[in-house]
């Protein structure tokens, strides 16, 4: 089965080139080679094109300049997925990267006829990959729709194309975009494969959405509104 890696991108306050380059370098060394990369770019400038040009002869890359819904992360992620053609679609956020050079191979080999999506283990770095901490092994909990995230960011998920053909990231959400889609997919397609290998590193930095929200004086009320919306959408 051919794989697609869907990457939504933007400027990240001047660090977008650095982050995408780091991610591409971990893609280049993957042992599994039957994949494409799709970049959906919300940047107002064209600096990320230089990174794409640098790697375009190393693996198959499709670059899409997305001028719609600027600043809406779920919409940009959906656009990246929409342009994917693989049998399995692996979501990767621009500021995260693969921790294991066999990550794609392990994800590919784990898929079967009984399961339609997968979540893998992850760790975290605050110093751009010099040190790693907090290995998180995904598990389900019934409060995930209330924002109790025991899985991690969307960078740990992969799904068969038919899943994303039917279910999209909810474009009205920010902080709950991951928990909501996990709940939605499980409700329709059943349990994921829980791959308890650490395959992805989540980069912790000041410009990531969770950091910006935590620094906002309205963060609690904004999150509460999103949680109530998700409960109304799925439980009422």
PLM regions with names:
Residues 12-29:
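Short, well-formed alpha-helical segments that are part of the catalytic scaffolds
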